[in-house]
């Protein structure tokens, strides 16, 4: 047990980002309620970041804040804000203003080549294996590794992995790969019929899955800024 009353540690969490393309509070509220109704177990009372970059000239923050709060979503921060007046208004509401990370400038090349590190022997990545059906209401999490399910996943079940997710059976529940922020994570399944699929926080609800892949063997991964899907051969 630590001798200090608190301890600060760095960590990372995956949050959904609500990108506003309309500044009308009622339109925003209705659109969010429609999305929440499609995946209530995943989205109801979920923490979110609100990006206002596309609409900040038109934003009346108090009304938008109330509209989003009325849906049950919890605003953890606002990004994409550059107008000083609006920044002040959001800050006074007690909501953090977030700055999206920028790419670091490349370091100058060293004058002498650095010798490569010695090879690591017997480096093993753990994998969590589930042989039983995953039933509605069950949640399975595979921290720091891949998750393999060799059976069916029912509607209402949830699979979460920091690495890849493989489902060799009917996938009807929710699959969240790259939960720790790994954008290279992927989802593989032999029968794609999921309520929700997510990689590093980028997600599709069932109605976003292209019809030609629904119920088929599929592989999902992140493109530059959105999920992509292709046949699993």
From Swiss-Prot:
Pfam families the UniProt entry points to: MinC_C, MinC_N
Domain of life: Bacteria
GO biological process assignments: cell morphogenesis; division septum assembly; regulation of cell division; regulation of cell septum assembly
Gene3D superfamilies membership: 2.160.20.70, 3.30.70.260
Keyword annotations from UniProtKB, A to Z: Cell cycle, Cell division, Septation
Positions with biased composition (Pro residues): 107-120
Region annotation Disordered: where it falls in the sequence: 98-123
InterPro entries: CAP/MinC_C, MinC, MinC_C_sf, MinC_N, Septum_form_inhib_MinC_C
Role: Cell division inhibitor that blocks the formation of polar Z ring septums. Rapidly oscillates between the poles of the cell to destabilize FtsZ filaments that have formed before they mature into polar Z rings. Prevents FtsZ polymerization.
Subunit annotation: Interacts with MinD and FtsZ.
Entry similarity comment: Belongs to the MinC family.
Protein name in UniProt: Probable septum site-determining protein MinC
